Amino acid sequence: MKKWSILLATALVAALALTGCPKQAPALGTEQNPIIMSFVPSGDTQEIIAGGEQIAKMITDKTGLVVKANVGTDFAAVREAMGAGKAHIGWLNTFNYVLAHEKYGVDVALVTVRFGSTSYTGEIIVRADSGITKLEDLKGKTMCWVDPNSTSGYIIPRIMLKANGIDPDKDFAKTVEAGSHNNVVTAVYNGDCDAGACYSDARSSVEKTLPDVKEKVVILATTTEIPNDTVSFTKDFPKDMRDKIVNALLEIAASEEGQAALQTVYSIAGLEKAEDSFYDAFRADLNKAGINIEDLAK
């Protein structure tokens, strides 16, 4: 009996020791704890996730780090996921990036390149047969926006409208949040909106399904230059992993397979290294327009 009591006590002590030791979290970049790379839903979500998954696999093949891709439900969702530690890498549009940097310390590593440039413009589009020929004609019309966190599909066009004497909060009969640039173009094409804001030239993204879109939908006005969107990392992301992923992405962008995936995601032609200061001029433009990033980040 004494022997059994000793064995039982030993077993209990061992069990308590095991339960008392917290399990070590799986290492980041493993199947059990993958690196999450999140994309904003600025275009066709199915195409974005298809291209994103290809890019994630290529990163894994080059670095050995397990990377999983997803698409946010909206623009803000990606930013907030990074702030909550639920996403580690964000392909953030410009406005979303400067807000995420201010609010959560998210830091840019790469800027996208299109048409040989690291900047782009937004535009306001209308149907060719709408009779709208100048910005003033938009008063009393239905306006289509992408998302309140979209740089070229909301923020910058609103600044342009205000500079031309149009109050985007009061002068439209109705406003619609379409959710993506593709949806804005389609809504204007179908006559669901009289005008829409999007990047230049978002019409190309829907040309496969709407081959006459550039005849039916025309550009009314173009915004000032905007710095391109980013590949950004969370504040505490390990530097060694970040360096590996950045180098892998630069190699991917230089390969034929990688270029095809980048085109699928956001019509990206290349990637370049960037620092946060690249976006200072954009911040200055926002401040001039009365948009205070520090206040928005509170």
What is each PLM-predicted segment?
Residues 94-104, 162-163, 187-190, 194-215:
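A ligand-binding cleft/hinge motif common to bilobed small-molecule-binding domains
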Residues 30-60, 226, 232-233, 237-298:
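An extracytoplasmic/periplasmic, membrane-proximal ligand-sensing/linker region
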Residues 76-90, 103-104, 136-139, 180-201:
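Short helices/loops that flank or line small-molecule/ion binding pockets
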Residues 1-32, 297-298:
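Short, low-complexity disordered leader/linker segments with a strong preference
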Residues 32, 37-62, 72, 95, ...:
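Bilobed "Venus flytrap"/periplasmic-binding protein-like clamshell domains
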Residues 107-117, 171-174, 208-225:
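Short beta-strand->loop
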Residues 80-137:
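Acidic, polar ligand-binding/catalytic clefts
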Residues 83, 101, 116-119, 136-137, ...:
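Extracellular/periplasmic catalytic domains that process cell-envelope and extracellular macromolecules
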